[in-house]
């Protein structure tokens, strides 16, 4: 089975596929972010989920080099998006047209905006933590503008194992469908006959606070990460509709998370998909109220 819708509507069909014993090629990070507990609880065996996101596929492949106990850190790579190197003070007048111009990937508008704010990377940190059972503080984000190294695993002996290839989603999709086997001639490999440069830079959390916010929500609870995701979707749509400034995207999400924090801390896990939907709707409503108040 393949699950690829962009929002949490993919959760229920994914749960049904897992309960039926199907192998699931998962390209729907929102299901893990908002309802990972429900998703993983539907598995009838431990190896049912094949991650399709390029970063998680890379980690999944790299983890074959050691045991879980030997993993020191996961290193998630980010291209940096169209505003890599910008400071927060430079971002107030960014337009949707500018933010939709991603330097590496051609994606839908919401994912492209998420990539520009690095909220997409924050969601990927949440997904990696839950998929691979690694604590939030043991997941690092590094900016790698060439997008050749798709993510890495650092082991306790100091070795770092990565998966590298030219950016092409056919590769993780094919592996997600064929694993544990590999198909032949899926995509081009790296060209070792020409000089190339791979660079890695630290993430600027002041300019791009979305990853730190996602990490805070991950530490707090599954309900917090569901609110993060739902509020972000509303804020991104408002930005694309010219109803919210660029910096207002992550600021709005943080305000919603902070406002709902107290009511989310009772029971950290959702009892059902229906409860998740209720919390998501409330997060969207609050985000809309904040957005409308800024007009």
PLM feature spans:
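Catalytic, metal-anchored helix/loop core of enzyme active sites in primary metabolism
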Residues: 1-295
């Amino acid at each position: 089975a393949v699950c690829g819708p962009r929002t949490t509507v993919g959760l229920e069909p994914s749960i049904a596929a897992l309960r039926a014993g199907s192998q699931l090629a998962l390209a729907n990070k929102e299901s893990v972010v908002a309802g990972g507990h429900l998703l993983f609880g539907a598995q009838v065996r431990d190896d049912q989920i094949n991650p399709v996101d390029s970063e998680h596929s890379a980690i999944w492949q790299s983890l074959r080099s050691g045991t879980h106990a030997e993993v020191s850190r996961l290193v998630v790579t980010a291209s940096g998006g169209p505003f890599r190197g910008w400071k927060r003070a430079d971002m107030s007048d960014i337009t949707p047209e500018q933010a939709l111009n991603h330097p590496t990937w051609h994606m839908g508008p919401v994912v492209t905006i998420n990539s520009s704010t690095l909220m997409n990377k924050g969601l990927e940190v949440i997904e990696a933590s839950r998929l691979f059972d690694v604590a939030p503080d043991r997941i690092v984000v590094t900016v790698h503008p060439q997008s050749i190294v798709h993510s890495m695993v650092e082991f306790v002996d100091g070795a770092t194992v990565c998966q590298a290839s030219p950016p092409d989603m056919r590769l993780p999709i094919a592996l997600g469908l064929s694993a544990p086997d590999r198909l032949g001639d899926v995509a081009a490999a790296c060209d070792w006959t020409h000089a190339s440069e791979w660079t890695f830079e630290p993430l600027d959390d002041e300019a791009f606070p979305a990853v730190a916010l996602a990490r805070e929500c991950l530490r707090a609870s599954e309900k917090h990460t569901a609110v993060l995701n739902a509020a972000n979707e509303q804020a991104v749509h408002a930005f694309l509709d010219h109803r919210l400034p660029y910096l207002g995207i992550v600021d709005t999400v943080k305000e919603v998370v902070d406002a709902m924090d107290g009511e989310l801390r009772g029971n950290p896990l959702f009892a059902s998909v229906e409860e998740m939907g209720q919390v998501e709707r409330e997060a969207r409503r609050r985000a809309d109220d904040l957005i409308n108040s800024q007009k």
